[in-house]
C-alpha cells in the first residue's frame, strides 16, 4: 500500500498536523477565529510592506515625497499604501479581540502560549510605532520625539539611552533610517514568534468556551474549521478593502499630510487609535517616570493574569460576577481610548485618572476577589 505523502513527508507532516488533521474541540465559537485572522493580517502586511519598501526612501529629505510619489505614480501604489496603513488597524482590532477572548475563557492558563502571545503583542506595538514614523509627516515626527523621549525618564542612563536610540541629539536622519531597518525586521520576528506560539498551543490543544477538557470530543480541523476560517478571512478582507477604498484616511491623523517640521509643534500630539488607551494611562500621572511606569505596566500586566486566577472554573461562561467585571473592564478601555484622543484639560484629566485607576484595580484586585467569592457562592 502506498504511503500517504501528507502524513509521512517530513515537511507536509508538520503542515498536516497543524492545519488538516489537528484534533480540535467540537464546540469552539467564532471567537476562536481571530488567531488565523491575525495570521492573514501578518501575511498581508508583509506582502504590502515589501511592495512599499521597494519604492520608499528612508531619508528625511526624501521620505515624505517618496510616499507621495508612490501614491501618485506607482501602479496601484495608493491601494497598496492604503491596505498597509489600514491593515495595521485591522491587525490591532484582531489582536485585542483575541486577547479579550483569552481573558474571558481562561485561555491564559496555557501559560507558555499566553506569555509568547504577550511578547507578540509587544513586538507588534514596536513594529507599528516605528512604521508610523516612516512617512515623515508632522505626527510621525512628533510622535517619535515624544515616545522615544520617555526613555529619558529612566534614572541615570535615560538621557544617554535616548541619544543612542536617536543617533544624535534629536529625531533626525539616523533615527529614520534605523526605524526603517527595524520596521523591515520586526514582522519576520513576529512570524517566528507566531510559530513558537502555535507550537506551545499544539502541546496542549485549544481551550473551548466551557473551559473543560475536550479530549473525548475532538474533530479534525479540516474541513470543519478550515471552512469556518475561510469565512472569517472573507469577512475581514472585505472590511479591509472597504476601509482602504472608501475612507482610507478615516483612522489616520490629518497632521501627517504636512511634512515633518521640527520648528512647528502640532496642537495635539496623539498616537494612532490603537495606542490611545496606553497614552491616556501615561498622561494620567503628572510625573514623567511615574507615567512611563504606568504605561509599561498597562501592557506588562498581561503577564500577571495567569497568576491572579483564583476561580476553580477556567472560563467565565458560568461566572456572572466575573462577566460583569469583564464588561466593565472593556468599557473602561473604551473610555481610556476616547480620553487619549482628547486634549489635556478639564474634565478629561480627571476622567483619565479615574479610568486608569479602575483599569489596574479591576485586573489586580477585583478579579481575584470576585473569583474567590464565586467559589464560595458555588460551594466549590
UniProtKB/Swiss-Prot annotation:
One cellular component term from this protein's GO annotations in UniProt: mitochondrial inner membrane
Transmembrane segment boundaries: 34-54, 78-99, 114-134, 179-199, 227-247, 289-309, 321-341, 348-368
PANTHER family: CYTOCHROME B (PTHR19271:SF16)
MF annotations from Gene Ontology: metal ion binding; ubiquinol-cytochrome-c reductase activity
Function: Component of the ubiquinol-cytochrome c reductase complex (complex III or cytochrome b-c1 complex) that is part of the mitochondrial respiratory chain. The b-c1 complex mediates electron transfer from ubiquinol to cytochrome c. Contributes to the generation of a proton gradient across the mitochondrial membrane that is then used for ATP synthesis.
Protein name in the entry: Cytochrome b
Cofactor details (free text): Binds 2 heme b groups non-covalently.
Binding site for heme b b566: 98, 197
Membrane topology: Multi-pass membrane protein
UniProt binding sites for a ubiquinone: 202
Disulfide topology: none
Xref: InterPro entries: Cyt_b/b6_C (IPR005798), Cyt_b/b6_C_sf (IPR036150), Cyt_b/b6_N (IPR005797), Cytb/b6-like_sf (IPR027387), Cytochrome_b (IPR030689), Cytochrome_b_C_euk/bac (IPR048260), Cytochrome_b_N_euk/bac (IPR048259), Di-haem_cyt_TM (IPR016174)
Keyword annotations of the record: Electron transport, Heme, Iron, Membrane, Metal-binding, Mitochondrion, Mitochondrion inner membrane, Respiratory chain, Transmembrane, Transmembrane helix, Transport, Ubiquinone
More info: Heme 1 (or BL or b562) is low-potential and absorbs at about 562 nm, and heme 2 (or BH or b566) is high-potential and absorbs at about 566 nm.
UniProt similarity note: Belongs to the cytochrome b family.
Record text on subunit structure and interactions: The cytochrome bc1 complex contains 11 subunits: 3 respiratory subunits (MT-CYB, CYC1 and UQCRFS1), 2 core proteins (UQCRC1 and UQCRC2) and 6 low-molecular weight proteins (UQCRH/QCR6, UQCRB/QCR7, UQCRQ/QCR8, UQCR10/QCR9, UQCR11/QCR10 and a cleavage product of UQCRFS1). This cytochrome bc1 complex then forms a dimer.
PROSITE patterns named among the record's database cross-references: CYTB_CTER, CYTB_NTER
Cofactor requirement: heme b
